[in-house]
Amino acid sequence: MILIIYAHPYPQHSHANKRMLEQAGTLEGVEIRSLYQLYPDFNIDVAAEQAALARADLVIWQHPMQWYSVPPLLKLWMDKVLSHGWAYGHNGIALRGKSLMWAVTTGGGESHFDIGSFPGFPVLAQPLQATALYCGMKWLPPFAMHCTFICDDETLQAQARRYRQRLIDWQEAHQNG
């Protein structure tokens, strides 16, 4: 099962993420958990989130880039749900062997992330990749949709279909276990 942990603080203003979820939602074996819809008060049901993660084979953290990072509710979700003794540490094996993919949208182009002497966009994934690896997960190449503020509808739809195809490809590669 593919579990999408979706964190958009302003989903009503989303163009790219909305289309990505619409495409992903057409697939069987995909569960979407919209954190800002489920937890507008930021009071996360840790047991429910851990149960959802336990059902998943592939976990996707999907969100718009905010200040070169994840939205605040997704960070809080990580802090609460990926707990010691469950996700990592002594007896923390619940996520071991599962896969994690980062699906992120940005308003700027990929070159926008060439900051100083750093090599650009891939550097921004490092904390998320480190989190996945620390929890014993397999890190998959991220899915990034850039320039979403200036994309026309046709481009957004094409990118959302590309996202859907990534999920289909993963499902087909893992259908036998």
Curated annotation (Swiss-Prot):
Cellular compartment(s): Cell inner membrane
Molecular functions per Gene Ontology: electron transfer activity; FMN binding; NADH:ubiquinone reductase (non-electrogenic) activity; NADPH dehydrogenase (quinone) activity
Location, primary (coarse class): membrane
A Pfam family reported for this protein in Swiss-Prot or TrEMBL: Flavodoxin_2
Cofactor: FMN
Keywords: Cell inner membrane, Cell membrane, Flavoprotein, FMN, Membrane, NAD, Oxidoreductase
Residues the entry annotates as binding FMN: H8, S14, H15, A16, N17, M65, Q66, W67, Y68, T105, T106, G107, G108
Keyword match ATP-binding: no
Substrates-to-products reaction catalysed: a quinone + NADH + H(+) = a quinol + NAD(+); a quinone + NADPH + H(+) = a quinol + NADP(+)
Disulfide bridge map: none
Entry similarity comment: Belongs to the NAD(P)H dehydrogenase (quinone) family. KefF subfamily.
Oligomer and partners: Homodimer. Interacts with KefC.
HAMAP family, A to Z: K_H_efflux_KefF (MF_01414)
Protein function: Regulatory subunit of a potassium efflux system that confers protection against electrophiles. Required for full activity of KefC. Shows redox enzymatic activity, but this enzymatic activity is not required for activation of KefC.
Name by which UniProt lists this protein: Glutathione-regulated potassium-efflux system ancillary protein KefF
Species per Swiss-Prot/TrEMBL record: Klebsiella aerogenes (Enterobacter aerogenes)
